[in-house]
């Protein structure tokens, strides 16, 4: 039985080991003394760290790789036809879902699980950064600059992790504390409708052993709170509703910093500031500060950590920010390239609003829609997602393994976006050419959960060459 004592270097095999969630667990299990191997057909920035830790990573799926494994870990994205998964089933190897393994780790500790349709990576990363002095175990869905990784084993009782609602795997968890940032319509191909998503979150909150910290700025969560059993301990937070237990007011922006006063149960705790823009990030910071105080982190430590926190990789990730000659009378232009994971309409709108609040330059959103099913189900919600930009460029939809059963395209999405300057560009070379010809100060934000980050990095590298 896993965690029943390591016997002769028990062997764990991860199918899809380079994924952001799978790789974090692989690192933790390696540090716990397990013999860890895995396979993934996609090589990325995570692979090098896994190899440096002595983890064997195969670049193809083959049943020979799995032979001798005591356990196989697979995410729900792995198809039943996968040869490694088939071999494990046919040979009696214990198979765990990624979410099951994460829950087994977290449930044994003072687990703090961060859930929500949007903001869970930023919130869990921010909490991890603020709690570093307490030496927590960390498993988050992005690369946290403070630890240069998405995972870190800790020696204390604290375990900070994201809770994934997309496939209901967060229902394996029984955390001591839970943070719920919001609920929105997403992954409808799995859940069917919004009410089913709410029911899943209610179950998750009921699994929480001590305290659930819930955002009242989300109307869906407000309703969920009314449907919870009376015996559940709930603490609320808000930047709009002063009845919340944790409340931020007197919000202002100075020198690209967001400053606010924090009140807990009507008592002024003090003034705090963030170096990442947007009201949604103030919301994200409120449960972080509250929990850090609860676990004994000083106000000075909290503020210092918040000042240093720049977000995790692919969350408002500035890749390039320099002045370049524009070729017209040797005048200079300031060009900023930003990489961001936002792919749901709500995330896109919040991110672009936040950038517009601190950036006066021309703003261009270059968006790669993610999954045919998501575009189909959320088509109407994309209508006002881009109201804060000067131009929208759409790439073809990133399939993420889906078949186009809905016969939908970026051209159709273009017709639903409420903006008079939307263009579809099918080739990366066209986008590179467009960015290189800019004549005025501009910020280009590359958005999506597919491979658009690679394009953003390529353009940033080319601009670096132009600036030398």
Swiss-Prot record:
It catalyses: UDP-N-acetyl-alpha-D-muramate + L-alanine + ATP = UDP-N-acetyl-alpha-D-muramoyl-L-alanine + ADP + phosphate + H(+). Coiled coil: none annotated. Its EC number is 6.3.2.8. GO terms for molecular function: ATP binding; UDP-N-acetylmuramate-L-alanine ligase activity. It is found in: Cytoplasm. GO terms for cellular component: cytoplasm. Pathway: Cell wall biogenesis; peptidoglycan biosynthesis. This is UDP-N-acetylmuramate--L-alanine ligase. The gene is murC.
